[in-house]
Amino acid sequence: MMLMMLPFIGSVSVSESLVAMTTVCLVYLILKFFQTEIPEGLRRLPGPKPLPIIGNVLEMGSRPYLSLTAMSKRYGNVFQIQIGMRPVVVLSGSETVRQALIKQGDDFAGRPDLYSFRFINEGKSLAFSTDKAGIWRARRKLAYSALRSFATLEGTTPEYSCVLEEHVCKEGEYLIKQLNTAMTADGSFDPFRHIVVSVANVICGMCFGRRYDHDDQELVGLVTLSDEFGRVVGSGNPADFIPILQYLPSATMKNFLRINGRFTEFVQKIVTEHYTTFDKDNIRDITDSLIDHCEDRKLDENSNVQMSDEKIVGIVNDLFGAGFDTVSTALSWSVMYLVAHPEIQERLYQEIEDKVGLDRMPLLSDKPNLPFLEAFILEILRHSSFLPFTIPHCTTKDTSLNGYFIPKDTCVFINQWQINHDPEMWKDPSSFNPDRFLSADGSEVNKLDGEKVMAFGMGKRRCIGEVIARNEVYLFLAILIQKLHFLPIPGEKLDMTPEYGLTMKHKRCHLKATMRARNEH
């Protein structure tokens, strides 16, 4: 989302040409900016003064969510920065963001036409697409309907209420065995390494109806690709913000295209197989559900927007990538917080022992009876804020917010980290305290406080897989806490410093775990 550095240009003549051309572009943009008429009664956006060509990149540093939070204290909840040659409006504060994304949702529902966005899922991405409103809404409705249909699919045996529950319970049980094996062989384990593969398997099961061995090269390759995608997108593509760089060779862009090509090739192969074996009376997974809804749309003469089969590949690709990365990151952070706060880990175990027992696995139906676990997950999402920004938004027309004029096609950043750490909303926001979400007697979660946490976006672009993701995180965690006691390695300090990216990961480390004895309490 930001420029980390400008690419090195070796030839002096090329450098001089680049400077000259970018200077011309810069002068043009500056003149255009100052020629923009501000409607009567509205104000020009405040913000730091940009440097020529690179804008405010240097002020953003390696942790832009912190830098932009600091700027919001100086300039307010609506201000403008410049990244390269592109003006960007930054929104902070829960009420301001709610006003923009919900009350003025249509005005801020676009996606900026960033150069790199054109190549994500070959331009067919639901999350990153700059499609016109009607087309985008039709695709979103299709994806949402498919997810809703999938959520009602029953498990293969009566003990599971749905397919999601079956996938997570089976994979959770296998994950515990894998961690025990690692403990026996090595005395410790890398939590992210094992969690990420287990979550990928659940996503593969839900999207594609298949499960892999943890050392399967295709699965390991997908995990690696997803990690690379997060790093590349998180570090930013200079061509998104300095347009002339689109025409110059770029190692970053070459790698970006390679990653997207591999993902698309993998999903295209599976979608093709699903078309070959599709049976409308036997919906097996999300891909089948998408095909089913897509076929219904083709038969609907009243449908204004027909959906091409290629769009299914883009939607499946989005659901796989987003669901896999978000859930695995949430779970790995959760384990880190369990180790960092042993007293909280014991309270969670006690709650599960009291409300679920130790003779069966926790299920989705147990969720209302485990308020402290729900509060713990909410505090993970708030305190870590591992999704510091939403995917950038874009204004669809000239608009205003908090009295400031914002032109059409302006790129907009939503600072979720600031909202989740705003001292005006949260008492002692830097402290990790799940109890902040509980009622006075601890018997239930305060829903209004829980809704203040921003992790999945808001409004028309809110993540459509949020409910599935939350249920998956809950169920995985309940299973792990019921069976395992997570511990640090003696003498090693736990480093909770996030590493910036599209999703912020904790630094890779090793932990220990022991099986819970049934008579432990």
From Swiss-Prot:
GO MF annotation list = heme binding; iron ion binding; steroid 17-alpha-monooxygenase activity
* A Pfam short name: p450
Q: List the GO cellular component terms.
A: endoplasmic reticulum membrane
Asked whether the keyword Oxidoreductase is assigned, the reply is yes
Reported EC number(s) for this entry are 1.14.14.1
The name this protein carries in UniProt is: Cytochrome P450 1A1
Q: Which domain of life is it from?
A: Eukaryota
The family annotation for this protein states: Belongs to the cytochrome P450 family.
Q: Which source organism does the UniProt entry give? A: Limanda limanda
Work out whether the entry's keyword set contains Nucleus.
no
Q: Could you tell me where this protein is found in the cell? A: Endoplasmic reticulum membrane; Microsome membrane
Recorded catalytic reaction(s): these are:
an organic molecule + reduced [NADPH--hemoprotein reductase] + O2 = an alcohol + oxidized [NADPH--hemoprotein reductase] + H2O + H(+)
Membrane topology classification: Peripheral membrane protein
Binding residues for substrate, per the UniProt record?
Answer: F229
- Keyword annotations of the record: Endoplasmic reticulum, Heme, Iron, Membrane, Metal-binding, Microsome, Monooxygenase, Oxidoreductase
Record gene name: cyp1a1
- Cofactor names: heme
Q: Where does this chain mainly localize?
A: endoplasmic reticulum
Functionally, this protein is described as follows: Cytochromes P450 are a group of heme-thiolate monooxygenases. They oxidize a variety of structurally unrelated compounds, including steroids, fatty acids, and xenobiotics.
The protein's matches in InterPro entries, at most eight in alphabetical order, are given as:
Cyt_P450, Cyt_P450_CS, Cyt_P450_E_grp-I, Cyt_P450_E_grp-I_CYP1, Cyt_P450_sf
Per its UniProt entry, what is the enzyme's top EC class, as one word?
oxidoreductase
- Residue numbers binding heme: C463
